[in-house]
Amino acid sequence: QTKQQQEGNTLWLKEGEPSVETMLELFAQYDLNVINELVFCGFGEPLERLEDVCRGIDSLKETYPNLKVRLNTIGLANLIHGRDVTPELKGRFDTVSISLNAPDEKEFLELTRSKFGIQSYEAIKEFAVLSKQYVPNVVMTVVEKVMPEEKIQKCQEICDTLGVTLRVRPFEN
């Protein structure tokens, strides 16, 4: 499908945060056997609602046991919840994709304005490392054309050190 075709066939939230029941009702309108991957993402952090996301995935996997699920995250869930939540990802997510966004903590904080301050950058890297224990695929991402090549190379070095894949996402208007 083209991006234009997808716009009319989307689960983008238009009005507030749905309950788990509403989310499952929306998913029930689709045959999830024909999709490659279900992605939890958004403007914000999907794991703000960790329990709801887990309940929803558990329910969906009862019907679709082979459903592939990806989490797109900023990687701050452990700071949000004040504990290590990565064990709860096991068996639920096949991929965790963390927005690295920057080659250093200062630039990351300038870009994200995280309420957790300068510790956020180390926290996302730790989240990546911890996630590897529970999730088969852990990647960190940056956006091409937004970042010069030398900064992308620095991000690659960070990912190499962490033992995760760097994915350079295409810039989309």
Where would I find each of the regions flagged by the language model?
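Sparse, context-dependent recognition of short Cys/His-centered cofactor- or disulfide-binding micro-motifs
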Residues: 8, 23, 31-32, 81, ...
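Canonical Radical SAM [4Fe-4S] cluster-binding loop centered on the CxxxCxxC motif
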Residues: 1-18
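Conserved AdoMet/S-adenosylmethionine-binding subsite of the radical SAM
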Residues: 28, 37, 43-173
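Glycine/small-residue-rich loop that forms an oxyanion/phosphate-binding "nest" at active or ligand-binding sites
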Residues: 19-21, 25-35, 39-41
